[in-house]
Amino acid sequence: MKRNRLSFMNKVLLSSPAVKQPRLGCCSPLSQAHMRAARLDWGSLPHRVVLCVFQYLPLIDRARASSVCRRWNEVFHIPDLWRKFEFELNQSATSYFNSTHPDLIQQIIKKHAAHLQYVSFKVDSSTESAEAACGILSQLVNCSTQTLGLISTAKPSFMTMSKSHFVSALTVLFVNSKSLSSIKIEDTPVDDPSLSILVANNSDTLRRLKMSSCPHVSSDGILCVADHCQGLRELALNYYMLSDELLLALSNETHVNLEHLRIDVVSENPGQIEFHSIKRQSWDALIKHSPGVNVVMYFFLYEEEMETFFKEETPVTHLYFGRSVSKGILGRLSLNCPRLVELVVCANGIQVIDNELICIAEHCKNLTALGLSECEVSCTAFIEFVRLCGRKLTHLSIMEDVLIPDDVCSLDEIHTEVSKYLGRIWFPDVMPVW
C-alpha cells in the first residue's frame, strides 16, 4: 500500500506544473502565479521530509524525483541514502535480473564510495560478471565498508575466474576498510593469506564470517581468524575446516560468546568415505563457554559416508539431511543430540522409521520443528510422535506420501488427531499436480 502511494506521488511529481515550464502566452497571470506558488511549495519541503520519502523509493524513482528541483537533487546525494547498495551484474542474454547501469556504477564510485557501508554484489553464472564485480571491488579504496556480501545467483561464478584477480580485489577492501563487521564470501577462491590480511586490519570489528565452500582456505586459515577475532559471533564453514583446535579457540575465555555456528558437511573429494571426528571434550568446551549457541549442520552425504557422525554426544541444534539417511543414523540422534531443535530429513528410502521418530520425541526435549519427505512413517507412530512433542512443535511439514495408513488410523483421520495435540489446525503437505 505504501509503495502504491509513493509511486502515485512520483507520477504526480513528474507530471506536476512544478516540473513543467509554462509556455508564454498560454496561461493567464493568475494561473502563472498559481504555478509559481506550487513550485515554491515543492522546493520548500524540509530536507528531512524529502529524505524520509526518498528512503522508501527504489533507486530509479529516487533519481527521477531528484530532477524536480535543486533542493531535491541535494537530498538525492545525502550520504544517508548511500550507506547500502547492491551492485547487480549479469549478461543480459542469459540472466533474468537487470544489471546496474555502468554510468551509475561510476557515479557511485566517484561520489559515494566514501559513504558505502553495506555493500553486496549479485552476479549471474558468467565469469564476466564475477570479473566485473571484482573490478568494482578493487576501486572501493576510500570507503568505510562494514558489511560485504558476494552472491552468486546460479553456479558459483567467482570460482571460475582467476584466483589471483579475485584475491587482489578482495585484499584492497580488507586493507582499506578498517571496520568490517560482517562478511559473506561463500563459493569464492579466498585463501589463507587473504584471511591473514583481513585479520590484520579488522580483527577488532569482525562479528560475522560466512565462508562455506571456499576450497582454498585450510583449517589453519580459519583457526587464525578465531584466534585473533575475539568478537566473532557467527561463523559458517565446511566440515573439513572444523577442528578440535578451532572449537577450543572459540571457547577461549577472552572470546565473546558464539551465537551461530553453521557447518556444511559435503564430500570434498569423489569417493571420500571417511571423515575426521571431533572430540566430545571440544564440543563440551564450546557449550560451556557459549551455552546459547545454535549449531547448524547441513549434510549432503550418502549413507556410507556418514559412519563417523553422531557416535558421541553432539550439541547440534538444527540438522538438515539433504540426501538419504539410514535408520541407524536417525537412531543415534535420540541418544546423542539432546539439544536438537529442528530436524529435516529429505529422504530415507522405503524403511519405516516409526521407532526412530518416537525415540527422538522422547529424548530430544527441545524439538520444535520437523520436516519429512520421501520417508515412511505409520499414521499411528506419527500421531504418537506429535503427542509426545505436544504444542511446542511449532513447525511441522510432512508430505502426505510419507504417512502410511494402518489399522488404527487412516489418512482421512490423521489431521484431526494431530490438530488436537498441536492445538491448531494441521494438514499434511500435498505435492501439487500441474
From Swiss-Prot:
Pathway: Protein modification; protein ubiquitination
Record-annotated F-box domain positions: 39-85
Tissue: Expressed in the adenohypophysis, hypothalamus (especially in the suprachiasmatic nucleus or nuclei, SCN) and pineal, all neuroendocrine structures associated with timing and homeostasis.
A Gene Ontology term for the protein's cellular component: SCF ubiquitin ligase complex
Subcellular location: Cytoplasm, Cytosol; Nucleus
Pfam families in alphabetical order: F-box-like (PF12937)
UniProt GO BP: entrainment of circadian clock by photoperiod; protein ubiquitination; rhythmic process
Keyword Iron-sulfur: no
Protein keywords: Biological rhythms, Cytoplasm, Leucine-rich repeat, Nucleus, Repeat, Ubl conjugation pathway
Its job: Substrate-recognition component of the SCF(FBXL21) E3 ubiquitin ligase complex involved in circadian rhythm function. Plays a key role in the maintenance of both the speed and the robustness of the circadian clock oscillation. The SCF(FBXL21) complex mainly acts in the cytosol and mediates ubiquitination of CRY proteins (CRY1 and CRY2), leading to CRY proteins stabilization. The SCF(FBXL21) complex counteracts the activity of the SCF(FBXL3) complex and protects CRY proteins from degradation.
Record's subunit section: Part of the SCF (SKP1-CUL1-F-box) E3 ubiquitin-protein ligase complex SCF(FBXL21) composed of CUL1, SKP1, RBX1 and FBXL21. Interacts with CRY2. Interacts with CRY1.
Protein name in UniProt: F-box/LRR-repeat protein 21
Organism field: Ovis aries (Sheep)
Highest classification ranks of the organism: Eukaryota, Metazoa, Chordata, Craniata, Vertebrata
Encoding gene, per UniProt annotation: Fbxl21
